[in-house]
Amino acid sequence: ETTMSTTMDVQSEENVRIAVPSKMCIDTLKALPNQPVTFTISPDKNAIELKSEFGRYKLIGQNADDFPKIPESNAENSFNIPSGVLSSSIAQTIFSSGNDELRLSLTGVYVQLYKDNAVFVATDANRLVKVERTDVTPGVETSFILPKKALNLLKSNLPQDDSTTQVDFNESNAFFSFGDVSLVCRLIDERYPDYRAVIPEENPNKLTINRTDFLNSVKRISIFGNKTTNQINIKITGSELTIHAEDIDLSNEAVERLGCDYSGEDMEIGFNSRLLIEMLQNLSTPNIIIELSSPSRAGIILPSENVDNENLLMLLMPMMIAGNA
């Protein structure tokens, strides 16, 4: 489903093809200091010998003809995106994707392409992250779902600079090319749900708070909450925010109060602290904005200031508060 390849310059006496046992080869190279290594390959026996300044190491490979063939591009569409932009867009969304194989469409990142912008979306049905990039111009309007495993591999190898990644895609595969590296992944062949339907449009209650203070408070309070539900309750009254959690079975309870800037009706709403913490950790602005409509509808979390050419929106579904049903 995912293939990564790269090229490098070597000094070779002839052309040869062989499949190398990756783990043994990598472990050997990792254990060597930085020095030239000589490979001697006998294709008829699938034999490989590594030679370093310290000694010789023999291992058996496989016939290169038995190696799975890399899908050819045959791309119907293509566009370029700054490598750093692609990396950050993946990092900002992938943590919010699901793991339920019965809901396969939610296990990846949904990419919507427009002529002059691109949108990345991920959700596990309890939370959602949407990143819009206005500095990407695909020149085509389409969409596809990229699998999580391939995106994690891509993210860990993308350069964090101003270089460009070329993205080619057709109905079944996506092809990423940057530097000497190419990655091919099979697209998730599922229909993505209409995520826009769960984003509340009218959110008259707006809260602005220091992200770090809020994050640390939620971390402390969650220690005392129920470990099954991870629920914390947030009550907003005027310019004061109260965070509360308890585990009735173990008689544990904690409460903290923080100052905030709030406009709207007094409200109490419940959230999953584990999900909230992860979302706050994936924001970088000093302050965040939380927009609310009612205790029974999703909360919108926004950075107080978006970085250039980026619009970021996070959504977290509420949890029912006992006595408010």
Segments predicted by a language model, with ranges:
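Structural preference for solvent-exposed beta-strand-turn elements
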Residues: 1-325
